[in-house]
Swiss-Prot record:
Official protein name in the record: Squalene synthase 10
Catalytic activities: 2 (2E,6E)-farnesyl diphosphate + NADH + H(+) = squalene + 2 diphosphate + NAD(+); 2 (2E,6E)-farnesyl diphosphate + NADPH + H(+) = squalene + 2 diphosphate + NADP(+)
Protein family: Belongs to the phytoene/squalene synthase family.
Highest taxon of source: Eukaryota
UniProt keyword Transmembrane present: yes
Signals that turn on the gene: Induced methyl jasmonate (MeJA) in adventitious roots.
Pfam families referenced in this protein's UniProt entry, alphabetically: SQS_PSY
Enzyme Commission number, as recorded: 2.5.1.21
Chief subcellular location: endoplasmic reticulum
GO biological process entries: farnesyl diphosphate metabolic process; isoprenoid biosynthetic process; response to jasmonic acid
Length: 415
């Protein structure tokens, strides 16, 4: 759970954190007994605990398909991300990956930590993939083939223009959106969404990650990973790595705000995509990451810490998003709240201020017109009045900790 200091500062986070912890224990007990499926679900929880939690809400067949889709693409991404692999070796693997998933003898050692285990033991993923229905397999193969080819293209090509940036993000994330839409449709639960809306769902998430991960990517050893488009950063500095130096802070923040403004263009499509979903489990599966994305953009905007260290939503706020996101009204409320936070951080002297404000106002207009912004809803950005007595907070924390320990020890084994 979150640290004691964070919980004392935000006591309203404790109950969502408690529920999240119990849900995580519940999810871990849902791991199937078959060795290949046990490996896949265990690995899913290791590479993405939050994704592992949300996926558990899907129906059994769709859950299995999405689990394998995710692991196949994580494996593909591990090959792409490993800068120690030569281009001559990497490109053919990326191009042929869609065939490797049918071969339960294939594996390729690369990556680190849990990703190395995923690659070394990839036969488990292949065996699970072969268990899926034909509609699911065809969708996964198609997206893997297209993504591998796109990744291979950008191994040999730098991201120069905004069009290049959009194309790269399409290959590595927009195609994930298209693939998930195909899986939802194959399950019979949803109509097939348009490629344009599906693509925007992926691009909004990917661009957020690229913005947030600037420092990690630029410091990658043995070779930097550079995804910010030259068309944007060259307006502010001579080299992309110059953004991390303190003497360039003013220009770096302007460049950062330019990148965030570019990402915001996809928000309206994302709201449309989510509003068309019918199934509550699929809706939550899609909505939670999108709220996390706009929340992360709000934290990153105008924030020099992006160039100094890690910027991410506190764990308690993440737990609140997972706990409170049930309906489209919740999504409209969250997007409105975080767009308000973004708007409050816009400096009128910023060269992109007019464009940024225009995009934020378009998001806010959609949220207001939805009729979902009632006075009774819980806000993500307006903190509770700090009238808490510190002693009472500590007592409350102790009581809730005891309650959590009791609930944890008494969870039925069948959960």
């Amino acid at each position: 759970m979150g640290s004691l200091g964070a919980i004392l500062k935000h006591p309203e986070d404790f109950y969502p954190l408690l529920k999240l912890k119990i849900a995580a224990r519940h999810a871990e007990k849902q791991i199937p007994s078959e060795p290949h499926w046990a490996f896949c679900y265990s690995m899913l929880h290791k590479v993405s605990r939050s994704f592992g939690l949300v996926i558990q809400q899907l129906g059994p067949q769709l859950r299995d398909a999405v689990c394998i889709f995710y692991l196949v693409l994580r494996a593909l991404d591990t090959v792409e991300d490993d800068t120690s692999i030569s281009t001559e070796v990497k490109v053919p693997i990326l191009m042929a990956f869609h065939r490797h998933i049918y071969d339960n003898d294939w594996h390729f050692s690369c990556g680190t930590k849990e990703y190395k285990v995923l690659m070394d033991e990839f036969h488990h993923v292949s065996n699970a993939f072969l268990d899926l229905g034909s509609g699911y397999k065809e969708a996964i193969e198609d997206i893997t083939m297209r993504m591998g080819a796109g990744m291979a293209k950008f191994i040999c090509k730098e991201v120069e223009t905004i069009d290049d940036y959009d194309e790269y993000c399409h290959y590595v994330a927009g195609l994930v959106g298209l693939g998930l839409s195909k899986l939802f449709h194959a399950s019979g639960a949803e109509d097939l969404a348009t490629d344009s809306l599906s693509n925007s769902m992926g691009l909004f998430l990917q661009k957020t990650n690229i913005i947030r991960d600037y420092l990690e990517d630029i410091n990658e050893i043995p070779k930097s990973r550079m995804f910010w488009p030259r068309q944007i950063w060259s307006k502010y500095v001579d080299k992309l790595e110059d953004l991390k130096y303190e003497e360039n802070s003013a220009k770096a923040v302007q460049c950062l705000n330019d990148m965030v403004t570019d990402a915001l263009v996809h928000a309206e499509d994302c709201l449309k995509y989510m509003s068309d979903l019918r199934g509550p489990a699929i809706f939550r599966f899609c909505a939670i990451p999108q709220i996390m994305a706009i929340g992360t953009l709000a934290l990153c905007f105008n924030n020099t810490q992006v160039f100094r260290g890690v910027v991410k939503m506190r764990r308690g706020l993440t737990a609140k998003v997972i706990d409170q996101t049930k309906t489209m009204s919740d999504v409209y409320g969250a997007f409105f709240d975080f767009s308000c936070l973004l708007k409050s951080k816009v400096d009128n002297n910023d060269p992109n201020a007019t464009k940024t404000l225009s995009r934020l106002e378009a998001i806010q207009k959609i949220c207001k017109n939805s009729g979902a912004l009632t006075t009774k809803r819980k806000s993500y950005i307006i903190e509770n009045e700090s009238g808490y007595n510190s002693t009472l907070i500590v007592i409350l924390f102790i009581i809730l900790a005891i309650l959590y320990a009791y609930l944890s020890s008494n969870l039925p084994n069948s959960l």
